[in-house]
Amino acid sequence: MREEEIQEHQLFISSLFLWVKLKMQNKLSSKRKKMRWKIIFFIIASTPFRWIQSSYLFFKLSKVNLETNQPVFVIGHWRSGTTHLHYLIAQDKQFSYLEAFQAFFFRVAFVSKTFMRPVLNYFMPSTRPQDNIKIDASAPTEEEHPLTNLTEKSGMQTFFFPQNKTYFDKYNIFENTKENEKRAWKKVYHKMLCQIALFHGKDKKLLLKNPHNTARIKVLLELYPKAKFIFIHRNPYDVYQSNIHLYNKTIKSQF
């Protein structure tokens, strides 16, 4: 199967501090030098906008209250149909959700949405490479993407650096995770959800879809005791074959 050459990366609008930390924690493939330089370029170019957004959100995030309107989580193994279910439930206007634009430009979304949303729509493929599901800048997507943009404490970092499964072990299944590391994960995750809620109007209930959360139910309930979970499953043989396809089309092209 032909390997898909991914032109963009979730770490484009991260921080230099996070990028250096990830480089120190991983041995990067020599084949991906061009992508590494692109990441550094976009990190530097986005720095002023990240500072402006941080200042803008400094007092606003503290006013977002997720205690009284706790999230609904769609969970299930990768390739089980979580995206289809997320798209379907997101049609209900009582919910707000993370859209692709905010996910990709998370650190600058509030200050760049007027001019960057049409740019993203122009450059985005019309379908996802792994399954041909239609996407655009407004499509619902999973919050694990911006989590990788904010911290190394994300299971998806193992997707970006497939030779290092520490991220998955420590921040998906919380195996051998120190208590202070778990607290740090909760803090950054909660702050991220507040930012997602604020982007769409903080009074709506958050609808979140994230296969990584399937292994985090206990930790999420510590954060949101009244949260609801919707679990979807699929024939495991189909799931296995679909994940092989996902690996060959996207994950294989990472660092």
Predicted regions mapped to residue ranges:
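N-terminal signal-anchor transmembrane helix
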Residues: Q53-H77, A103-V108, S112-F115
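Post-Walker A helix-loop "phosphate-sensing" segment adjacent to the P-loop in P-loop NTPases
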Residues: Q91-F101
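PAPS-dependent sulfotransferase catalytic core
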Residues: Q241-F255
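Charged, amphipathic alpha-helical linker segments immediately N-terminal to NTP-binding catalytic cores
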Residues: R2-W51
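Short His-Asn-centered micro-motif
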Residues: I75-H77, L207-P211
